[in-house]
A protein has these predicted regions:
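C-terminal and inter-domain tail/linker signature
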Residues: 1-145
């Protein structure tokens, strides 16, 4: 029973926040002292989670995520997702490119007392930057592009 409740909580959060931009869902699905584990250090609190969602939803106003797989075990829920959208706003210093992007990734959420207490996110950042035209792969030696 706990696995299905945890899965429902995570699905509610992901769909409302990421697909509809409704960050109010975070107040009921995420713990007050939520920890978002990021490559540059842990970020604490619901407000940071809201800011993250809003940053991506502002940069990609038509952002849509599809949830390909979801697996729950104990207090963890793992979700494999694909996101698509059009880059129409600034994101991390990258001005709007007007380009469409499609990336995949994985969220891991740990729940405690029915709320998301920790989150990890891994996604194809290199693929996103390539699709936005921010970076290019260099042509191998001897091959002209």
């Amino acid at each position: 029973m706990a696995n299905s409740q945890n899965t429902a909580t995570v699905r509610d959060f992901l769909d409302a926040a990421w697909n509809r931009g409704d960050t109010s869902v975070i107040d009921r699905t995420a713990a007050e002292h939520h920890v978002e584990h990021e490559p540059d250090g842990d970020q604490l609190g619901r407000d940071h989670l809201k800011e993250t969602v809003l940053a991506y939803r502002t940069a990609f106003p038509d952002l849509q995520m599809s949830f390909e797989d979801q697996i729950a075990d104990g207090d963890r829920v793992v979700t494999r997702w694909t996101a698509s959208g059009t880059h129409l706003g600034e994101l991390n210093g990258i001005g709007a490119t007007g380009r469409a992007a499609n990336v995949s990734g994985v969220f891991i959420h740990r729940l405690a007392d029915g709320q998301i207490s920790e989150s990890w996110s891994m996604f194809d950042q290199m693929g996103l930057l390539l699709q936005l035209g921010v970076i290019e792969f260099p042509a191998p030696d001897g091959i002209s592009s």
